[in-house]
A protein has these predicted regions:
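Alpha/beta-hydrolase
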Residues: 141, 145-148, 152-256
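Short beta-to-alpha linker loops that shape the active-site pocket of alpha/beta-hydrolase fold enzymes
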Residues: 62-66, 131, 263
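Conserved HGGG/HGGXW glycine-rich cap/lid loop of the alpha/beta-hydrolase fold
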Residues: 10-71, 76
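Catalytic active-site module of serine/aspartate enzymes centered on a nucleophile-bearing elbow/loop
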Residues: 253-290
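Conserved donor sugar-nucleotide recognition element shared by glycan-biosynthetic enzymes
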Residues: 79-84, 107-108, 242
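Conserved hydrolase catalytic core segment
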Residues: 97-137
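Active-site loop/oxyanion-hole signature of alpha/beta-hydrolase fold enzymes
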Residues: 65-100
C-alpha cells in the first residue's frame, strides 16, 4: 500500500450528458491506474472490489444515465461507442492512459468499443461476462429475448420488466424463438412491485438495453489494438447469456475465457448468487500482474 492517497470527484461535460467520475490517487504506486467500469452499474458497485487494490490509483465512474451522471434526454438510448467516448474523456481528464481496466457486464461491451476507438487507452482489459447477444451462436433468439424484456418494461413498468430480466438472465443454454416468445413471470415471484410508476428511463431496462446487447463490435480494430484482453466467465454462471457472451467474444479474439469464482457479480458479496470477492479480486490481480 502506498503512503499517500487522495480522493477526488469530478465531472466531464459531453454532448448530451454530464458524467461524474471518482479518482482515488496513489502517487507512489508502481502500477498503472486501474479503472473499474460497469453498465449500468456505477462507481458504488465497485467499492468492495476497489478495496483489494489499495496499491493502485483507482478510477470509477457512473455511466451516463446512471446514478450521478445525468443525460439531457433520459429516454434516449446510449450505445457502446458513445460510452467509449465518455470513458476516453474520463481517462484523459484523470491523467491520461494507458490504464488497466476491469469491466463487468455491459461495461465489458463498452470497454471493447473503447479499445477499438482508442487503442492506446488500455494496457490490459479484463472483460467479465459481456452480455453480447449479437455475438452468440443463437444471436437471433437471444436478441429477440432482449427485445422482449424491453417490451415488457415498456408495457408494464419496472417490476414486470425486472422479473422478465431475471427469468432470461437465469436461463442456461442456447435460447430459442419459443423461449423468446414466453411472457415474463409474475413480478411477485421475485419480490418485485406489481404496480407501474410510469417511468421508462431505467438505465438497465430502458432503450439502452438494446443498444448495448445488440452492439456489433469492430472486431478487426479490437484485434489490432495493443491491449491485452482477457475474457472472464463465472464458475457459477455457466450457460447463462452473459457467461456465454464471454465465450463468444473470446472465440472472436482467438482465446479462451478465464474462469472466475462466483457468478455474474462474483466480485461483490451477494445473497442472490454465489460470490467470493476475495478470490475474485485475487484472480483479477493475477491477470494484471502477469
Amino acid at each position: 500500500m502506498t503512503e499517500t492517497m487522495s480522493q477526488t470527484t469530478d465531472t466531464i461535460t459531453m454532448p448530451g450528458a454530464k458524467v461524474v467520475y471518482d479518482v482515488v490517487e496513489r502517487p507512489g504506486s508502481a502500477h498503472l491506474p486501474l479503472m473499474l467500469i460497469g453498465q449500468p452499474m456505477g462507481a458504488s458497485g465497485f467499492a468492495e472490489l476497489a478495496k483489494h487494490f489499495d496499491d493502485r490509483t483507482i478510477i470509477t465512474y457512473d455511466p451516463r444515465g446512471a446514478e450521478r451522471s445525468a443525460k439531457d434526454d433520459p429516454m434516449s438510448a446510449t450505445g457502446p461507442d458513445t460510452h467509449a467516448d465518455d470513458l476516453h474523456k474520463v481517462i484523459q481528464q484523470a491523467g491520461g492512459g494507458p490504464v488497466d481496466v476491469f469491466a463487468s457486464s455491459g461495461g465489458a461491451i463498452n470497454a471493447l468499443a473503447l479499445v477499438a476507438k482508442y487503442p492506446n487507452d488500455v494496457h490490459t482489459l479484463v472483460a467479465h461476462e459481456p452480455p453480447l447477444a449479437s455475438a452468440l451462436p443463437d444471436a437471433g433468439p437471444a436478441v429477440a429475448t432482449v427485445k422482449a424484456i424491453h417490451a415488457t418494461y415498456e408495457q408494464s413498468g419496472w417490476g414486470a420488466g425486472m422479473a422478465h430480466f431475471i427469468m432470461v438472465t437465469s436461463q442456461r443454454g442456447p435460447l430459442t424463438a419459443e423461449f423468446a416468445a414466453q411472457p415474463g413471470p409474475d413480478p411477485q415471484m421475485f419480490g418485485m412491485p406489481t404496480g407501474d410508476d410510469g417511468k421508462r428511463s431505467d438505465p438497465l431496462l430502458g432503450p439502452s438495453i438494446l443498444a448495448i446487447t445488440t452492439y456489433q463490435p469492430d472486431w478487426d480494430a479490437v484485434r489490432a489494438a495493443p491491449t491485452h484482453i482477457v475474457l472472464g466467465a463465472g464458475e457459477a454462471s455457466d450457460g447463462q447469456m452473459a457467461n456465454r457472451g464471454a465465450h463468444a467474444v473470446a472465440q472472436q479474439l482467438g482465446s479462451e475465457p478465464v474462469m472466475f469464482p462466483g457468478g455474474h457479480g462474483g466480485f461483490n458479496t451477494s445473497e442472490w448468487e454465489p460470490s467470493d470477492p476475495d478470490a475474485f479480486a485475487a484472480k483479477v490481480r493475477d491477470i494484471l500482474d502477469a
